[in-house]
Structures are given as structure tokens and as C-alpha cells.
Amino acid sequence: MEIKVESINNNFCKLSYEDIEIIMMKENEYINATRLCSSRGRDILDWMSKESSVELINELDRINRSCNDYYDYRGIVLNVVSDSETSELYVHRDLILHISHWISPLFSLKVVKFINSYIQDSYQLEYELIHKKSLMDQLKEIILLNDDNNM
């Protein structure tokens, strides 16, 4: 799965795969739900006004606050105001499965696969960077030892 990643500015990036485009906050990986819904003719506020959605948001908030996982203290749903391309409602990625399923079950399959692939690629890249840093540190140590032995 080839995902196109484009930086919008220091705070946001655009992820594209086939006919799906997602705007994501770089600092916390929250996803622009307003744009995702409107791309399929839906309004995120309709989903958020459902009692089951409110319960889901509250429960996810409670779970995330009790875990040690990274969690944006501002909440599960953020109203971001910055510019015309990125201002709108952003949601924790755990909600995207539910929101995209509300839009369309088939759309949800694509969105979730797309996001999981992006996250997996990100972790793989992070692992490779950590591994390269470790190798560089080892190489520096060898060079320093060699320099000490040659003095």
C-alpha cells in the first residue's frame, strides 16, 4: 500500500491513498473528521450528536486518561482553528473506525487499512532510525578507541 504523505505546514500533513485523503495533526496523529466526513457527503456533527457517539467519546476519553499511553490532554475531539485548509474538528484515531463505519462499512475498511498501514510504516521508520543511531554510536565508540590507541 503506497501512501502519499505531504506536509501542509509545521502542524499538519495530508495523507492520500486511492480516493481517500486525510488531514492529520503531526503532534498527536488526530485526524480531521470534518474533512473525512464531508468527502463522502456526511457531516461530522450528525455523528457526534448521536447518543451512542457521545457515549463512545466519553468512554474512550475515560480509558485513555487511565492508560499510560500518549494522550492529548485536550480531549478526544479537538476543535482546531488555524487556517482554511486545516481548521475543523479533529478526533483521536481510535474514533476513526467508528466514524468511517457510520459513513459506510466499505469505506471504513479502506480507511482503517490505510491508517494502520501509515502507522506501521511510521513505526518501521522509527525503528530503522533508532537502529541506525545505535550503529552510529557504536562506530563513534570504535573510532574513539582507535584514536586513543594511536596516541
From Swiss-Prot:
Record's PROSITE patterns?
KILA_N
Where does the KilA-N domain start and stop, copy by copy? 11-118
Q: Which Pfam families does the UniProt record give?
A: KilA-N (PF04383)
* Record keywords: Early protein
Domain of life where this protein originates: Viruses
According to UniProt, the name of this protein is Uncharacterized protein FPV248
Which species is this UniProt entry from?
Fowlpox virus (strain NVSL) (FPV)
Q: Show the taxonomic lineage.
A: Viruses, Varidnaviria, Bamfordvirae, Nucleocytoviricota, Pokkesviricetes
